[in-house]
């Protein structure tokens, strides 16, 4: 059994490709793949990433400081679509 990371290498290091990865996972599960038991998404309130600034008051709330992330709305849509199609 396997849990698939939709980001990092599976998205070619581009967080915006996570939707393509979850679509492929959806197709695999729909086709009968029983090996996949879960997935991981890089997600935050708002998309993208930012550097940690000395003056943290200048930083944007809800944007990752580590890996680039999809936003909350896209996260909800991807998960709802997965649930609807498996």
Per-region residue spans from a language model:
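Expand to "…catalyze enediolate/carbanion chemistry for C-C bond making/breaking, isomerization
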Residues: 1-86
């Amino acid at each position: 059994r396997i849990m698939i990371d939709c980001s990092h290498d599976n998205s070619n290091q581009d967080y915006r490709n996570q939707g393509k990865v979850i679509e492929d996972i959806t197709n695999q599960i729909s086709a009968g793949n029983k090996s996949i038991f879960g997935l991981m998404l890089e997600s935050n309130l708002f998309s993208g990433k930012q550097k940690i600034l000395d003056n943290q008051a200048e930083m944007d709330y809800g944007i990752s400081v580590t890996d680039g992330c999809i936003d909350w709305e896209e996260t909800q849509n991807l998960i709802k679509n997965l649930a609807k199609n498996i």
